[in-house]
Regions:
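N-terminal cap/leader regions of alpha/beta-hydrolase-fold enzymes
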Residues: 1-230
C-alpha cells in the first residue's frame, strides 16, 4: 500500500512517499532521492523495498519541486538551492516518523540513497547513530569539504559506486573508504567495473542503466538490510 504522508520536521512539516509491504509490517528503510526530486524512479525503489518486506519512506527533500529527466540544469539548480539544514531536519524527521510508525519492526532504521541521496545517506548516518544501523549508498558520497564528524558513525555501510563517474569518482570513494576503515568503521564501497553514474536508475537519463549489474546488486541489498534490521 502506497500513500503520501506528512511528518513533523523540526517545528515545521514535510511530506514523503510511504509504501508498506503486503503484510503491513516490516523493518523501516529510508529512501533518499536523486537530484531530480521525489520522482517515479525513487518511488519505484520504495515499492521494490516494500515488496521485499520493508516499510519504505522516501521524504520529499525539495518540498514539491521536481525536475524532469531531461532537465539537468533544473535538477542541478534544485540540488544546489536545497538548504542543507532543512534537508537534514527532513531526513531526521522522516527517520523518527518511520521508527514510531505502527508496523515498523526491527532493531533500527536502514537508509538507501542514490546519487545526491547516496551522499546524504552518509550524512544522516553520521548525524543519527541512535537510529540508523544500515546504509546502502549508490554512486554518491560526501566530498572532503562536506564530510561530517565521523566519530559517532556506527552504522554498517555497504556502498555501490560506478567505475565511470565524473560526479562521484571511484578514486574519491576509495579515499573515503580508506579513511573510514582507518577509523574502525564497518564500511565497504564497491566500484562496479564497466558501470556509469546512475547505473541503477530505471529512467536511464544518462544512458547508463545497467540491468545486468542491477540484477546482481539488488538481492544483496535486500539480504543486507534484512540481516541488519530483522
Amino acid at each position: 500500500m502506497a500513500e503520501t504522508i506528512s511528518f513533523p520536521s523540526n517545528g515545521s512539516e514535510a511530506s514523503g512517499y510511504l509504501v508498506r509491504p503486503d503484510g503491513g509490517s516490516g523493518p523501516g528503510v529510508l529512501v533518499i532521492q536523486e537530484w531530480w526530486g521525489l520522482d517515479s524512479a525513487i518511488k519505484e525503489m520504495a515499492s521494490r523495498l516494500a515488496a521485499a518486506g520493508f516499510v519504505a519512506l522516501a521524504p520529499d527533500l525539495y518540498h514539491g519541486e521536481l525536475a524532469a529527466h531531461d532537465e539537468m540544469d533544473k535538477a542541478g539548480a534544485l540540488m544546489h538551492s536545497m538548504p542543507p539544514d532543512r534537508a537534514a531536519r527532513d531526513m531526521s524527521g522522516a527517520i523518527d516518523y518511520l521508527a514510531g510508525l505502527d508496523g515498523v519492526t526491527g532493531s533500527g532504521i536502514g537508509v538507501v540513497g542514490f546519487c545526491m541521496g547516496g551522499m546524504l545517506s552518509f550524512l544522516i548516518a553520521a548525524a543519527r547513530p541512535d537510529r540508523v544501523v544500515a546504509v546502502v549508498p549508490f554512486y554518491g558520497y560526501p566530498p572532503p569539504e562536506m564530510e561530517p564528524d565521523w566519530s559517532n558513525l556506527s552504522a554498517t555501510i555497504r556502498g555501490h559506486m560506478a567505475e565511470h563517474d565524473d560526479f562521484f569518482t571511484p578514486e574519491g570513494a576509495a579515499a573515503l573508504e580508506a579513511k573510514l576503515l582507518g577509523m574502525g568503521k564497518d564500511v565497504s564501497l564497491t566500484v562496479h567495473p564497466g558501470t556509469g553514474h546512475a547505473f541503477m536508475a530505471s529512467h536511464n537519463a544518462f544512458g547508463t542503466l545497467n540491468e545486468e549489474v542491477a540484477a546482481v546488486i539488488w538481492p544483496q541489498v535486500i539480504a543486507f538490510m534484512h540481516d541488519k534490521l530483522d
